[in-house]
């Protein structure tokens, strides 16, 4: 009888560990997805040597457009995106990068300001991208759109962008 009880306890423990391990695995994979967000922009240029892309994005708010005059090409900036936790389609605010500062908000991207176009409600930024992102967009031509996946609260500018891919509307298969 005691042997049977030990076998049942062992089976229950194995089941709990299996289910618990699966739940932890799911939590980790969803946490990874939750650590990033996507945004879209028009590809201006790609520099494979410097591992950077230059992208034009829309500025959503009049206050942000008014602030553009305080920045110049080459400034290190923090782009604050408008949107939900995992997606943005426009810039909400532009800030001067804090030297040695740590980004402690979601939807904030460190970048180099390339140009501003207040009348067109857009700005152009340059960001560092990982090697695999360069390969993923090598066929994208300037003027075409890309989807960029960025990390929430990146520790450095070099790890802010996780991936880049050609922008594509959702398609259905029949």
What residue ranges belong to the model's regions?
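Short, flexible, surface-exposed loop segments at domain boundaries
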Residues: 2-174
């Amino acid at each position: 009888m005691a042997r049977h009880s030990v076998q049942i306890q062992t089976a229950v423990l194995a089941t709990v560990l299996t289910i618990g391990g699966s739940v932890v695995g799911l939590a980790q994979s969803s946490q990874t997805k939750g650590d990033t967000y996507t945004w879209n922009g028009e590809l201006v240029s790609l520099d494979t040597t410097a591992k950077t892309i230059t992208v034009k994005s829309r500025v959503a708010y009049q206050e942000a457009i008014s602030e553009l005059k305080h920045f110049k090409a080459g400034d290190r900036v923090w782009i604050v995106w408008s949107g939900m936790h995992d997606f943005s389609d426009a810039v909400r605010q532009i800030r001067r990068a804090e030297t040695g500062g740590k980004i402690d908000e979601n939807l904030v991207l460190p970048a180099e300001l390339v140009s501003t176009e207040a009348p067109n409600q857009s700005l152009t930024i340059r960001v560092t991208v990982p090697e695999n992102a360069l390969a993923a967009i090598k066929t994208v031509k300037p003027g075409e759109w890309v989807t960029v996946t960025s990390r929430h609260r990146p520790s450095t500018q070099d790890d802010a962008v996780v991936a880049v891919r050609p922008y594509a509307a959702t398609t259905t298969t029949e």
